[in-house]
């Protein structure tokens, strides 16, 4: 639902939220739209945080007829469960308001989509669509998109006709849009939406890569058998059937006229008939005499034109029937001119069907729908156990369906409707992040994994039994390595869902801390039911889930494919820069053992309840909790500041690649077209180089942010434990200073969460851009994928990223720090821009500290069990591959101390200058006062 500003003429009572910030089990956020008699707010579930739309109607403003329409809408929506109809979750009535809790549709309505069709490239959820199906100037939507939406609208209308419903107000404003299922399941930035049933977010028709359409606003809908006629004037005049405008009796075919007007507007970008009132509109319809003309500039296929003309017949008898409409080739046939990414991929469905257990009918229906959605064919009905939450696929009478008492609040934890996802092959870690192979609603997992209700509380569904049943093999696969087999065996032991683990940890921890100190946690641990340890697989943080007892046996290899040359290049650069700036050489083997990117945000520490303070957080002295909180806050801020410095450096690269960074500030529009062409000036080699540099820097920033969250996790665990115990520090814990520090930590954690999610998205954009640019290089180019078949083949089931030799975050950061220090030194000598010099020195220090980053710097040193060879080997490998030698650290630390000395001298110099200026100003003021005392005064002192 598109955001709209409140009218200045609206009364304060209309602008006021219906309750004190909550309606039933939902919290009201902000107003996102309004109608003649209702306001629409975005809201979220108190427990899961899933988004909903809350339609709040003030009863005092409704007359008897409008109240009947409202209660009729509620009655109808309670009985309807279809993927392409906006579902009603709940209805909460108070003394002054009726609040309808409905599905949230992030992309607004179809009218906004059509209006902003030339600016879809600026929205993250529609950017890929605009690239695959570009829209020419002064034309409507691309025909592929038009047919896709028409198929989904037809699916909703077919369901309504089976229940003898007529909507009577089909128009673009009542057709709401969600991001495509593929976008929701592969992008962490997608918002988590509360689903009404297991398949309410799974399209029944169309393409899974395009936005999902849902029919809304049943205020004028009614049950109307095919033999009955109605005579009420309702709906929007611009899309009304002529028989309604003539005040004649009408039947369900009135909806077909409205479908024709919507289809015409999608194809051309404008409605077929424009008028200021319904009388003038009727006159224009009559004058056209069924001759529907299309603009010359619009490219519309003859098949689509024929369907529009069949729908826009003045006489309902001559108008196409529902049966013919639902069986029309545009509805039932495949969508032509599909992009290669949307072409249907053949799957051995018959083999799967023959071995599928009987209890998995709902899953086979889902697979069937997905397979047919690519070709645009409606799914064929399959018998299955009836459920009040399920989409009726037989011919039901909706009025006879009685939903359960809380049926509207059914929630699918998996994100794509069934609560079950296909388990991906376990992927070994690689030199660069790889694309996740999970098909999961990652946004949903991000904020609800730690708060997911027990499985026993979920409404029983036949598909749930699949989680524990062995899955038959559908086709032969290549042999797995021993490590992959072991990882898969352990993964199959758990009845959990594969999720973006690190993103979940960051968001879940931030959610937990955000509730403090408003409510004291009831447990000493952070609940992480659906999160496991695993290997990093992509810059977006997706990881393969595995049991906690399965230790990681391999480590990320350095990004360079030729370690010798890389070390030489880095060492030479460091020595030359150090000699120029500081007059001494750094050890030649500096950073030779470092990783870039490091082991990406190594799995969240396997110490949910540590028994001792973390090494970095505690100095071994016995101090009060307040002092400890102060150290924690400072430590978290330090790591966050280092990540911010690296992020700023990565942004320099990113903005050269994407001149206008994706931003929700622009919504679906607002980006000048000329700015979108700036990236065309980059050569392929430059694009590859910038993408590689931006990628490793973003990954480095992510690792630093993850360390901040690790420290916050330890603090939060200890804080939660102390809150549930009668410790001697209970008084200090409740002190004002302690609460203030906790709030400070909370603010920092929320900032880290926001930055973490932003960097994940940008890293994925850069990764895709890098892969695309590498494919366009000449085949003999060293960076072309064909020259790295060995490396790429090691990434199971994912598209690997191969970086050029010599690319590492540490080298880039070191060179940048040296450059900034040198520039600051030159300006300091010339006494130019001293505040800028201070910023440059501080940034260089933070960047060099980030170069010194070690995965275990901030973590407690855990003992190595003498009875576990694996743990000993793991510790040895970590010490050999992840940590710098003491000589390397001393060299960098010496450099940091020298830059700090320069910074201290600069600050003293700036302080002296400031004091001199203040003294000079005071002297001037005193002179003026003395001169003023000698002048005659008109007012006595």
From Swiss-Prot:
Localization in the cell = Cytoplasm; Preautophagosomal structure membrane
- Specify residue ranges for compositional bias: Polar residues: 530-551
What are the entry keywords?
ATP-binding, Autophagy, Cytoplasm, Kinase, Membrane, Nucleotide-binding, Protein transport, Serine/threonine-protein kinase, Transferase, Transport
A Gene Ontology annotation in the biological process aspect, one of them, is: response to starvation
Tell me the PROSITE patterns matching this sequence.
Answer: PROTEIN_KINASE_ATP, PROTEIN_KINASE_DOM, PROTEIN_KINASE_ST
This molecule's function is given as:
Serine/threonine protein kinase involved in the cytoplasm to vacuole transport (Cvt) and found to be essential in autophagy, where it is required for the formation of autophagosomes. Involved in the clearance of protein aggregates which cannot be efficiently cleared by the proteasome. Required for selective autophagic degradation of the nucleus (nucleophagy) as well as for mitophagy which contributes to regulate mitochondrial quantity and quality by eliminating the mitochondria to a basal level to fulfill cellular energy requirements and preventing excess ROS production.
Q: Which family does it belong to?
A: Belongs to the protein kinase superfamily. Ser/Thr protein kinase family. APG1/unc-51/ULK1 subfamily.
Self-association and partners: Homodimer. Forms a ternary complex with ATG13 and ATG17.
- What name appears for this protein in its UniProt entry? Serine/threonine-protein kinase ATG1
Gene (name only): ATG1
